[in-house]
Swiss-Prot record:
Name the UniProt record assigns to this protein: Protease HtpX
Regions that span the bilayer: 4-24, 33-53, 147-167, 190-210
EC identifiers of the protein: 3.4.24.-
Classification lineage: Bacteria, Pseudomonadati, Pseudomonadota, Gammaproteobacteria, Pasteurellales
Biological process, per Gene Ontology: proteolysis
Cellular component per GO, a single term: plasma membrane
Location within or outside the cell: Cell inner membrane
NCBIfam families on file: PRK05457.1
CDD domains for this protein: M48B_HtpX_like (cd07335)
Amino acid sequence: MMRILLFLATNMAVMLVLGIILSVTGIAGNSTGGILIMALLFGFAGSLISLFLSKTMALRSVDGEVITQPRNQTERWLIDTVSRQAQKAGIPMPDVAIYHSPDVNAFATGATKSNSLVAVSTGLLNNMTEAEAEAVLAHEISHISNGDMVTMALLQGVLNTFVIFLSRVIATAVASSRNNNGEETRSSGIYFLVSMVLEMLFGVLASIIAMWFSRYREFRADAGSASLVGKEKMIMALQRLQQLHEPQNLEGSLNAFMINGKRSELFMSHPPLEKRIEALRNL
């Protein structure tokens, strides 16, 4: 969950800055071809910057410490387990980090398979058995072997491009119609306002698509974990999460806005735990 939020937040920040630059400067403002070219350049800039900064940002956000030399049995077990799973998955050994948090959590990130990171919280190590933690680590290794961060970056780049392109094409049409009515002094202000509003609206739709893909890749990572360590261990890990985290915080916050049931899943980066368990049992 955290790695997705970090990625999307960075991407959104870059998109907002670039969008303001585009609107204020009027770059490619009247040319559909020019808008498309700039949308492609700026659209992928946000996602690629997020991708290449993901490892550094994730570590800093949790104040994680990469294990360079194991200092105790737990760190040795982590290194040995990740090394064994990475070898089985056919990927280079990722960096392994621990961060202090009561939350039961782990994440994988990094721009490439050869420059990746797996991090686990002390809460996970303290609340899960070795078998359960092993399954969680295998889940994160599967994210790396599947190239999920790169795929997410490419998808986000495409979505960014459409958001920028459509918002500015529509804004240009609205501003131009005002110009035809003789209100030329308002065109730049209207263009900026319309493009920003549409960018936010289309951005929400793009986020829904990105969250759908995130849920899809979680199912794939669960299946990857089952392949590496066996589905029973992954099921046990998910059942442990059910005991520790239900009701889910995200669902609770969405319920406060009267978004319930299947509609709430639109905004979730992970599928409901019961669906993940059911999918594993059906493997």
